[in-house]
Amino acid sequence: MPDDEEKLQLLADVERLKKILRQKDEMLEEMEDDLKNQGKPCSSKLSLEERAQELSEQLRDLHVEMDGKNATILDRDALIDSLRSEIDKLEKINKEFANGSVIPEHDDSNSFGESEMLRISEDCQKYKETATALYERNAELEKEAVNLKDEIESMMDHIRDLKNHMETRDEEIARLEGELFDERNSHEGKLAARGNSMFSEVIDAERKVEEDLKVLHGENRALKGMVKRLRMEVEEVEERLRSSTKRFNVTRMTTSDIDVKEMRRLRDRVCHLETERVHLWERMFIKMRSIPKREVGALITGYFKSFELSIASVKGGFDGLMKDNEKYVTIIRGLQQEVENLKADIVQLQFDNKCAHRKAAPVVNKDFEHPLLAAPLKTLNNGRPSFFIKPKNVEPMPQLGHSLSSIAVTPQKPAAKFTTRSSIKDDTSEWAERRMKAQAEKKLATPTPRYNYIKLSEPVPKFKPAVLQMPSTSETKEN
């Protein structure tokens, strides 16, 4: 029956070790994925490539060190379990001795052994609490690593979207440049045929458009160069990823072989410790029967001192594990800082992309505007809109062809004062010409926001257009 229990215990230990190995494999795969994802968004600078190589080397060293620490932890766990079981058995034996025999009160060795047992039990409890805290901390670090992995994957998706967006924008810019060139060549003959009065304005507009096109062409070349560099970096990262994947497969095969050897070594170690424990108990019972009862406490105290030394060595191992955990925490914080830097680079790329589109949009819109609409506005110097200049004593009154709400008014020069009867006819003809000009401008194009125009609601019965009081020249200057 004890053999069956020992077999079950060994099977449970083997399952636990397999579970730990699976967890380590998963952690290794996650760290490899993190390294792969962190290598993709690197810029063209050599410092980032060197940093990626250093991180990969550090990660490889950490894997090797982690495997060694895992083996040490397993050895220490087995040793702690064996020591705890022996301590429990010794406590049971001590209780049996205390119940079966009467020890005099003046026996100092017995009191010393009890105090040592209490102190050692307290130390064991502290070590248990420390181990529990370490396990919890390791679980938190694993969760944090998983969160960082998800965040890096989302960032890589966002970078891929930005890259596709930049490519589409480059194609759109190239298409708009071609359309702009064709439109400029098609309108060149029309603008030249309008006469020498607009020739200077056309030359200025053409010069401005050419300057803007030069700027856009330079920006387009810079963006194309950036896209080319990014593609080369992506290809280089993919090549490094393939090589690292091959190395990882070889490393995984070697580590699996090492894990099998480690399991065999642990199994042999467990058998050796079991035989050692049996021989120890046999020697202890022989000595307890051969020596008087007063010396039993000193014997137990000696065994406890040896246990204390072994536990002190285990404590030193735990201190080393704590230092390793602190080192891993600093490494994770460094990776978080690198993630923040990558986010800042993404925001900067978005801002540069928006600036390029904003620079390209005004030039394209400006070239397609009508030449008459692009003329500068004239300032109003105590003038009135021509629409509200009412002729005096003219029969019959001209009828409006449409409602007042649909007429767009453009600023004109101030009207001259009426001095004679002949000036009334001239003013009437000017008013009719201005009205026809306003209707023609409305048919040509919809008024843009850069022109001043007045819109009225539906005409009221018996409506009389009022004369607007425009500010004087001195008031406009003061404002």
UniProtKB/Swiss-Prot annotation:
Disruption phenotype: Recessive embryonic lethality. Hemizygous mutants are viable and survive through embryogenesis, but are either lethal at the larval stage of development or sterile. The oocytes of sterile mutants have extra chromosomes and prematurely exit the prophase stage of meiosis which results in endomitosis. RNAi-mediated knockdown results in embryonic lethality. It is found in: Chromosome, Centromere, Kinetochore; Cytoplasm, Cytoskeleton, Spindle pole; Cytoplasm, Cytoskeleton. One of its GO terms (cellular component) is kinetochore. Residues 4-180, 210-250, 321-357 form a coiled coil. Changing F199A: Abolishes dynein recruitment to kinetochores. Signal peptide: none annotated. Keywords: Cell cycle, Cell division, Centromere, Chromosome, Chromosome partition, Coiled coil, Cytoplasm, Cytoskeleton, Kinetochore, Mitosis. Transmembrane segments: none annotated. GO terms for biological process: activation of mitotic cell cycle spindle assembly checkpoint; attachment of spindle microtubules to kinetochore; cell division; embryo development ending in birth or egg hatching; mitotic chromosome movement towards spindle pole; mitotic sister chromatid segregation; mitotic spindle assembly checkpoint signaling; positive regulation of kinetochore assembly. Interacts with Zwilch homolog zwl-1, a component of the RZZ complex. Interacts with mdf-1 and mdf-2. Transient kinetochore component required for chromosome and spindle pole alignment and chromosome segregation during mitosis. Functions downstream of the RZZ complex to mediate kinetochore-microtubule attachments and nuclear envelope breakdown during cell division. Required for kinetochore assembly and localizes the checkpoint proteins mdf-1 and mdf-2, dynein and dynactin to unattached kinetochores. This is Spindly-like protein spdl-1. It comes from Caenorhabditis elegans. The gene is spdl-1.
